[in-house]
């Protein structure tokens, strides 16, 4: 590929460094490996088609997460009217990553909780950073975190998400 630079990294280095993060976001959002692969590829195609800007690695990671979420949302909207004969809950989702118990538990939650809890506990973003990525008020993120933790506790019990 051409010598475009993103936050001082070549495109290949960006893909290598952030592929697991983008795959995880896509799988968490879509709950289907094949669909997640499509959105994963579209995320990096979208990044490459943009003009490289001077940005920090942190900003680049946040940008990739936001683009991945948008790609997944667009995919869901596009395929919303297609009736699936498969029951997606019965479909096995395989991750090429070493996922923690919390990552698997998040798959049981509705999207609005899953995204916020994933970004907070797995990606270790602060509330303010999540608010910026998802373009929401920090207080909304705090409320969503609390409600998501409560839902996890009701499903699994105990101190699964105490931090």
Stretches with model-predicted labels:
Residues 116-120:
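A short pre-motif secondary-structure segment
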Residues 77, 109, 149-163:
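Short, Lys/Arg-enriched C-terminal cap helix and immediately downstream tail that follows
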Residues 69, 134-158:
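DNA-recognition helix of helix-turn-helix
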Residues 74, 81-107, 126:
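Internal acidic/polar
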Residues 3-4, 31, 42-59, 78-80:
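Sigma70-family region 2
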